[in-house]
C-alpha cells in the first residue's frame, strides 16, 4: 500500500480461485490512514495549512438547493416519463451533490462552528426529501474512527446481505437498492436513539415535503424522491459507494477515483486523501496528492465510477463480502 504500509490479511481462498468468498477480508492491523497521516505530516507539515472550512460551501449548497426545488416546482404538471427522465439525467446529480455536501458538513467543513454546519446540513437535506443529515453524521464519524470494525462501521454490509447477494442478478438488484441498505443497516445492527437535532431535522423536512405537495402537487414531490432514489442506485454518481472501500485488491482497503465527476461530488473521489485528512475540504484534497504524491502513486485507483459498478456486478469473485473487517482493538 505504498508508503502507508501493508496489512496482514486473512480471507477464504475462494476469491483468489475465481469463486466468490464466503467471508469478509479480516485484517489484524489498524486501518492504514492514521499511520499514513502521521508519516505525511512529518514529511510535509505544510499540509496542515489546508485544514479548515471551504468558504464557498454555503454558496454552492444554496445554489443547488434553489435549483433543485425550482426544478421540482416547474415539473408540477409534467408527465411521469418526463419527470423520471429529468430526475435521472439532471435531478439525480443535484441530489447526490447535496448528499455529498452533507458528508462534507459532517466533518464541519463549511464553518468553524459545528452547529452552523449542522443547520446547513438540514438545509441541504431539503431537496433530498427524507430527513437524514443529522443521523448520517452520527454514523459517518464512526466510519472514520472505526473503519471496518465489526459491529461499528455501518458502511460495511451485513452478513445477511452477503449471504443473499451472491450472483450477478442479486448484485444488480443490490446496486439498485443501495440507499435502502445504507439506511436500514444501522437500524438493525446498531440502532441509536434519536436526539434533539434529529427531531429538528425531521420536523423541518416534513414541513418542506408537505409544503411541496400542497403548493405544487405530488408530481413535484415525486421528482425530488426519484432524484434521490435513482441517483443512489444504478447511476454513475453512486459508483463511489462501491469504489471507496470494496476490495478488488486484497492488500488495499480504500481506493480513490480521479475522474471528472469529482467536480460534482465535492471531490469525494479523493477518498484515500479524505480518510488520511478528514479536516481538509474537498476543494483542496487534490493538493494533498500533489504535495505528497509518492504516498498515493503506488495505490490502485479508478477513473470511472460506471466501470466500477460494472466490475462489481460482473466479477464473480466480488460481492458484499469484498470488504475489509477488523475487531475492535483494545486501544479503541
Swiss-Prot record:
Gene Ontology biological-process entries: sphingolipid biosynthetic process
Main location: endoplasmic reticulum
Entry comment describing in which tissues the protein is expressed: Specifically expressed in flowers.
Uppermost EC category: oxidoreductase
Coiled-coil region list: none
Gene Ontology cellular-component annotations: endoplasmic reticulum membrane
Ranges that cross the membrane: 55-75, 83-103, 119-139, 164-184, 197-217, 222-242
Locus of motif Histidine box-3: 271-275
Family membership: Belongs to the fatty acid desaturase type 1 family. DEGS subfamily.
Name used for this protein in its record: Sphingolipid delta(4)-desaturase DES1-like
Organism: Arabidopsis thaliana
Amino acid at each position: 500500500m505504498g508508503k502507508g504500509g501493508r496489512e496482514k490479511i486473512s480471507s477464504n481462498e475462494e476469491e483468489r480461485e475465481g469463486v466468490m468468498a464466503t467471508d469478509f477480508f479480516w485484517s489484524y492491523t489498524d486501518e492504514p490512514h492514521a499511520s499514513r497521516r502521521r508519516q505525511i505530516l512529518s514529511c510535509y507539515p505544510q499540509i496542515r495549512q489546508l485544514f479548515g472550512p471551504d468558504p464557498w460551501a454555503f454558496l454552492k449548497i444554496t445554489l443547488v438547493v434553489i435549483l433543485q426545488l425550482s426544478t421540482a416546482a416547474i415539473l408540477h404538471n409534467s408527465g411521469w416519463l418526463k419527470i423520471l427522465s429529468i430526475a435521472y439525467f439532471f435531478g439525480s446529480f443535484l441530489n447526490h451533490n447535496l448528499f455529498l455536501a452533507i458528508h462534507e458538513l459532517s466533518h464541519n467543513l463549511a464553518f468553524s462552528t459545528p452547529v452552523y454546519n449542522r443547520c446547513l446540513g438540514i438545509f441541504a437535506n431539503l431537496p433530498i426529501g427524507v430527513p437524514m443529515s443529522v443521523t448520517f453524521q452520527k454514523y459517518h464519524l464512526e466510519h472514520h474512527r472505526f473503519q471496518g470494525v465489526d459491529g461499528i462501521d455501518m458502511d460495511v454490509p451485513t452478513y445477511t446481505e452477503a449471504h443473499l447477494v451472491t450472483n450477478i442478478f442479486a448484485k444488480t438488484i443490490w446496486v439498485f437498492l443501495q440507499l435502502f441498505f445504507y439506511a436500514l443497516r444501522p437500524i438493525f445492527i446498531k440502532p441509536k436513539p434519536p436526539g434533539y437535532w434529529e427531531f429538528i431535522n425531521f420536523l423541518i423536512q416534513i414541513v418542506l415535503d408537505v409544503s411541496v405537495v400542497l403548493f405544487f402537487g405530488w408530481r413535484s414531490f415525486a421528482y425530488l424522491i426519484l432524484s434521490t432514489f435513482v441517483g443512489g442506485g444504478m447511476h454513475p454518481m453512486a459508483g463511489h459507494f462501491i469504489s471507496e472501500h470494496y476490495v478488488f485488491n486484497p492488500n488495499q482497503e480504500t481506493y480513490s477515483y480521479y475522474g471528472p465527476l469529482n467536480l460534482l461530488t465535492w471531490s469525494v473521489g479523493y477518498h484515500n486523501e479524505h480518510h488520511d485528512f478528514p479536516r481538509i475540504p474537498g476543494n483542496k484534497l487534490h493538493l494533498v496528492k500533489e504535495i505528497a504524491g509518492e504516498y498515493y502513486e503506488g495505490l490502485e485507483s479508478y477513473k470511472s465510477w460506471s466501470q466500477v459498478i460494472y466490475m462489481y456486478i460482473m466479477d464473480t469473485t466480488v460481492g458484499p463480502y469484498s470488504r475489509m473487517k477488523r475487531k475492535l482493538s483494545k486501544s479503541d
